[in-house]
From Swiss-Prot:
Entries under PROSITE patterns matching the protein: RIBOSOMAL_S12
Name this polypeptide is given: Small ribosomal subunit protein uS12
GO cellular component: small ribosomal subunit
Lineage, uppermost ranks: Bacteria, Pseudomonadati, Pseudomonadota, Gammaproteobacteria, Pasteurellales
UniProt cross-references to Pfam families, sorted A to Z: Ribosom_S12_S23
Natural source organism: Actinobacillus pleuropneumoniae
Function, in words: With S4 and S5 plays an important role in translational accuracy.
Modification type 3-methylthioaspartic acid: residues: 59
Gene Ontology biological process terms, A to Z: translation
Entry keyword annotation includes rRNA-binding: yes
GO MF annotations in UniProt: rRNA binding; structural constituent of ribosome; tRNA binding
């Protein structure tokens, strides 16, 4: 787990095109990593405490983790079909 230091969007590698949501996270062990925020819409901002899991995003260079939706400060995906 860690604290968001920056929440922003990046563009994927060719030939894909999107504005993928990612955040920079300072972990409790001192590492600073980039993590992908999955799902439609999110409530993360600077200083949000999030839980991350492994799993890279193939078309975003340097993104090797996913934020866990519905844990700590990260809300689950709103209006997601059950």
């Amino acid at each position: 787990r860690g604290v968001c230091t920056r929440v922003y969007t990046t563009t994927p590698k060719k030939p894909n095109s999107a504005l993928x949501k990612v955040c920079r996270i300072r972990l409790t062990n001192g590492f600073e990593v980039t993590s992908y925020i999955g799902g439609e819409g999110h409530n993360l901002q600077e200083h949000s405490v999030v839980l991350i899991r492994g799993g890279r995003v193939k078309d975003l260079p340097g993104v090797r983790y996913h934020t866990v939706r519905g844990a700590l400060d990260c809300a689950s995906v709103k209006d997601r079909k059950q």
